[in-house]
Regions:
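N-terminal "arm"/small-domain region of PLP-dependent enzymes with the aminotransferase-like
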Residues: 1-57, 65-66
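Conserved PLP-enzyme active-site core in the AAT-like
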Residues: 7-16, 76-306
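Conserved N-terminal alpha-helix of the aminotransferase class I/II PLP-enzyme fold
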Residues: 35-87, 109-117
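Glycine-centered tight turns that cap/initiate beta-strands
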Residues: 72, 143, 309-312, 359, ...
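PLP-dependent enzyme catalytic core of the Aspartate aminotransferase-like
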Residues: 115, 124-125, 142, 289, ...
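Active-site beta-loop-alpha junctions enriched in small/polar residues
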Residues: 152, 181-183, 318, 344, ...
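Conserved small-domain helix->loop->beta segment predominantly found in fold-type I
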Residues: 267-270, 274-276, 281, 285, ...
């Protein structure tokens, strides 16, 4: 099936009992066992099946199958938020004493997790620019457990050369984890460029309407965990789960299996089935919405780029952008709908611009059907110091726009009057 069809049909074909066409909401905590042996087999991972909604749920399962199909993966795991998905993905491969290498241009919450929370737990995170493959490679050592990046950076708008990054990481036997939230599988499928694991904030474009928080991890099933000395957690017995060896018990699904039964089970960041249902509704129209998002964003970027009050515009759809050529290869020249710009009067002008907006909403979400604006230095990246913000690709004058699917004339009209107010 094509991606547009997978978004509507993958993972579900009428309820077997009621023949209902809509995916049911299984609002339950638990599932009964046929007998004692059935329960034991489920807990020993000898048989697939439902145990407890903190670990799995039939509504969530449909969403997981659908997202996995769209990304071209073998399986997915849905979680309570995108940050939960990123945290669990790292915890699946790394522990105290290990390190990961990350592209520095990151969403503020991820940067904070990497710069402060993980180091407090004994996991070191080393960063370099996504534009400098050699610098990233120099950070890898025997204790490196993953290389992390965002396919399209938020809010920096950088587009990462996933093929070059993956080739370099695999040369050292390191898996690549890609946050594909901004691009979505409609614009970019990281597995096709060599990535091993994908994470999503489903809250954004996949949900699409600013109603529901959720996250997902998708496993390509291609990374060689078995007999890999860098990853004993996958090829040696796990004492916390009756000595199971994930690479043997789960084969190519070793990563996503361990993610489910270790960080999700033990940390508890489960996605509620009602949220899964809401996210499924958004997912069905992803392709249609992304076409409009990208079309509108390109026109807004071109408008801003020609405006006398604007000092710079960062959108990889503009030919003078340094990531334009990479965007042609990674996202077929459609770099989603997050753009940033600066006003010649600096941070003060940016604040006046945001305060003057009437149609565009002032808030920190992205990927909504509605157009949104924020000032990252005082919101999403506020916890970062000046050097950290610079590393993450955020300047004090940066205004981030998440362009929605309204008529583009109305979006530009609101930007025009707000710029006039910012003089």
């Amino acid at each position: 099936m094509k991606l547009e069809t997978q978004a509507i049909h993958a993972g579900f074909n009428d309820d077997p009992t009621t023949r209902a066409v809509a995916v049911p909401i299984y609002q339950t905590t638990s599932y009964s066992f046929r007998d004692t042996q059935h329960g034991a087999d489920l807990f020993d991972l000898k048989e697939p099946g439902n145990i407890y909604t903190r670990i799995m749920n039939p509504t969530n399962d449909v969403l997981e199958q659908r997202v996995a199909a769209m990304e071209g993966g073998i399986a997915a795991l849905c979680m309570a938020s995108g940050m939960a998905a990123i945290t669990a993905a790292i915890q699946t491969v790394a522990a105290a004493g290990d390190n990961i290498v990350s592209v520095s241009q990151l969403y503020g919450g991820t940067y904070n997790l990497f710069a402060h929370t993980f180091p407090q737990q004994g996991i070191e995170v080393r960063m370099a620019s996504g534009d400098d493959i050699a610098a990233l490679e120099a950070l890898i050592d025997d204790n490196t457990k993953a290389l992390f990046c965002e396919s399209i950076g938020n809010p920096a708008g950088n587009v990462v050369d996933l093929k070059a990054l993956s080739d370099m990481a695999h040369k050292h036997g390191v898996p690549v984890i890609v946050d594909n939230t901004v691009a979505t599988p409609y614009l970019c499928r990281p597995f096709e460029h060599g990535a091993d694991i994908v994470v999503h904030s489903l809250t954004k474009y996949i949900g699409g309407h600013g109603t529901t928080v959720g996250g997902a991890i998708v496993d390509s099933g291609k990374f060689p965990w078995k007999d890999n000395p860098r990853f004993p957690r996958f090829n040696q017995p796990d004492p916390s789960y009756h000595g199971v060896v994930y690479a043997e018990a789960m084969g190519e699904a070793a990563f996503i299996g361990r993610a489910r039964v270790v960080p999700l089970r033990n940390m508890g960041a489960a996605l509620a089935p009602l949220n899964a249902f809401m996210l499924l509704q958004g997912l069905e129209t992803l392709a249609l919405r992304m076409d409009r998002h990208v079309e509108n964003a390109q026109k807004v970027a071109e408008y801003l780029n020609a405006h006398e009050q604007v000092s710079w515009v960062n959108y990889a759809g503009l030919k003078d952008n340094k990531h334009y050529e990479v965007a042609q290869r990674m996202v077929a020249g459609k770099p989603s709908a997050i753009l940033s710009f600066g006003i010649k009067t600096g941070a003060e002008g940016g604040a006046k611009f945001i305060d003057a907006l009437q149609l565009i909403k002032r808030l920190v979400n992205i990927g909504d059907a509605k157009s949104l604006a924020c000032h990252p230095a005082t919101t999403t990246h506020r916890q970062l110091n000046e050097d950290e913000m610079k590393t993450a690709g955020v300047s004090t004058d940066l205004v981030r726009l998440s362009i929605g699917i309204e008529h583009v004339d109305d979006i530009i009209a609101d930007i025009e009057q707000a710029l006039a107010a910012a003089k």
